[in-house]
Amino acid sequence: MEFQKEILKGYIDIIIVSVLQEKPMYGYEIAKTIKGKTNENFEMKEATLYVSLKRLEKKNYLEGYWNDDKGTGGGRRRYYRITKEGKEFFKEKVNEWNLLKKLLNNFMEVHFNEKN
């Protein structure tokens, strides 16, 4: 089923914070996880991801740090982990989303029932 990817643009920050609830990750890993969780229906552009990560760090929702382990098979990677403020942000957004979902369901159910 096709959907307007523009709809997700307003939710990019919460999508990133949601993914980081699982564990700290580096940028490419975050993008790959998002792509997988959406069954490859949504792919976050690298520029969008890093602008969002920077914004979330500035708001103190995420904390970035460099992993200097030699076992990564490449250069240094910047990992991101969720902060206490980030967890609060996530909780607020989940509550907001649940309310929005209820409101929209009222309209969708009415419309669906009228068509049948």
Language-model-detected regions and their locations in the chain:
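Short, Lys/Arg-enriched N-terminal segment that forms or immediately precedes the first helix
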Residues: 1-5
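Basic amphipathic alpha-helical segments that dock to polyanions
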Residues: 49-56
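Alpha-helical transition-metal enzyme core signature, strongest for iron centers
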Residues: 27-30, 56, 97
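Amphipathic alpha-helical dimerization/coiled-coil segments
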Residues: 87-116
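Beta-hairpin "wing" of winged helix-turn-helix
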Residues: 57-75
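N-terminal helix-turn-helix DNA-binding core of bacterial DNA-binding proteins
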Residues: 6-48
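Accessory beta->alpha helical hairpin/"wing" motif in late/C-terminal subdomains of nucleic-acid enzymes
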Residues: 82-86
